[in-house]
């Protein structure tokens, strides 16, 4: 491979890695801002502190969230952010606005919406909306990991603690 080819390859790899890092940063910002009303939702829905561990470990690969209350909290947070339509599905316009407000460009925001929409379709129907929401969140997490967009929660937790 010529020197020019090697330089071009190095630049493409650097841009791809930079893109992943930027996506992880956006996902961290989205996660931090999404969870800001968690205490409010916990009080309103009388949710236990057991969900704190699920939110702390949410992005850890291999961590399974099984607590129904965590699904209820995610549903509550989504509602507070006006990201759900009257049927409880993702409101695409509001979700797009939220993603872009917290650092996603148009392409990434659309990809996030497409992922959630796909997860909504693939998650089995359940009369218990909390369980269904938990299924959608689990699917979303898996898809974000496939893209290598999951944020490093060590950094995110450090930022949360710095705000306290």
Curated annotation (Swiss-Prot):
Bridged cysteine pairs (disulfide): 41-76, 72-130, 119-139
Pfam families tied to this protein: PBP_GOBP
One of the GO BP terms on file: response to pheromone
Listed InterPro entries: Odorant/phero-bd_Lep, PBP/GOBP, PBP_GOBP_sf
Function: This major soluble protein in olfactory sensilla of male moths serves to solubilize the extremely hydrophobic pheromone molecules such as bombykol and to transport pheromone through the aqueous lymph to receptors located on olfactory cilia.
Protein family according to the UniProt entry: Belongs to the PBP/GOBP family.
Protein name: Pheromone-binding protein
Organism taxonomic ancestry: Eukaryota, Metazoa, Ecdysozoa, Arthropoda, Hexapoda
